[in-house]
Amino acid sequence: MSASGYKAGYISIVGRPNVGKSTLLNHLIKQKISITSRKAQTTRHRIHGILTDVQSQFIFVDTPGFQMRHRSQLNQVMNRVVLQSMQDVDVILFVLEAGRFGREDEQVLEQLPRNLPVILVINKIDLLPDKLQLLPFMQKMADLFDFADIVPVSALQNRQLSDLTEVIRHYLPENPPVFTEDEITDRSERFLAAELLREKVFRQIGEEVPYSVSVIIEQFAVEGNLRRIHACILVERENQKAIIIGKQGKKLKDMATQARKDMEVLFDGKVYLEIWVKVKSGWADDAIALKSMGYE
């Protein structure tokens, strides 16, 4: 690709938990690389998703949901990731849920830089009970911050995402591409395997357990078209271990099957997956343990 007139830049996606940031990223790049669930704090790491076309390269930075309710070391690390992600980028997407602007959204708004183009993305417009509420909500938000642009979308239904892409393109600087055309993320297959398994835990288990769960890939071997993966699901208490395993191991088996299928689609090959569940008390408040697990 010629660098002449070509645009490339980093776009940080920020917002409170559960506004649909990861779903937005996955649909923008047309590939699932960031895990999703209805539970807060599903995303824990900064993940780059890359969309490349003949005119531009969009390097999206998905981030954890910013929130101040929990004070664990893990939550502090995730909030720090969000704040760092708003530095050294070219554009920021501030994602809100249509018709909803609460204290947690306000806390994110207070962190937004004034020296960068910030695009307000109003997501989940399909869930707005009265569509006439949208324009007043957009005006309300425009009065609170000098947004470069405001774009209403439905990430889940792929509505107006092409419009959003064109708005972002306008604000990207002229640069040669950073990544090759076929790269869709900066994360390794090992990392993505851990995330896909953690997603299944979040989706299958009740409200409390997921926040005490982490996934560690202990072995990742590539043998031709086969990937052999040994994974450990880490929890904080014995009763959580029992919940994840389930009666006669059924829950764990179901999670393993679903994760393996997703991995085979993403990696375009066969996957042999073995999973263990281990207890490590207090890991979410252990700075050394968090660092060893790859938390920034």
Curated annotation (Swiss-Prot):
Q: Where is this region: G2?
A: 41-45
- Report whether Transferase shows up as a keyword of the record: no
The way this protein sits in the membrane is described as: Peripheral membrane protein
Fetch the InterPro entries from UniProt: G_ERA_dom, GTP-bd, GTPase_Era-like, KH_dom-like_a/b, KH_dom_type_2, KH_sf_prok-type, P-loop_NTPase, Small_GTP-bd
Q: Where is this region: G5?
A: 153-155
Which terms are listed as keywords in the entry? Cell inner membrane, Cell membrane, Cytoplasm, GTP-binding, Membrane, Nucleotide-binding, Ribosome biogenesis, RNA-binding, rRNA-binding
The terms describing its cellular component in GO are: cytosol; plasma membrane
Q: Where is this region: G4?
A: 123-126
Annotated spans, G3 = 62-65
Taking every annotated instance into account, which residue ranges of this chain make up the domain KH type-2? 205-281
Era-type G domain mapped to chain residues:
7-174
* Entry superkingdom: Bacteria
| UniProt subcellular location | Cytoplasm; Cell inner membrane
**Binding-site residues for GTP, renumbered to this chain:** 15-22, 62-66, 123-126
Quote the function comment for this protein: An essential GTPase that binds both GDP and GTP, with rapid nucleotide exchange. Plays a role in 16S rRNA processing and 30S ribosomal subunit biogenesis and possibly also in cell cycle regulation and energy metabolism.
Assembly: Monomer.
Q: Which NCBIfam families match?
A: era (TIGR00436), PRK00089.1 (NF000908), small_GTP (TIGR00231)
How is this protein named in the record?
A: GTPase Era
Which organism was this protein described from? Answer: Nitrosomonas eutropha (strain DSM 101675 / C91 / Nm57)
- State the encoding gene: era
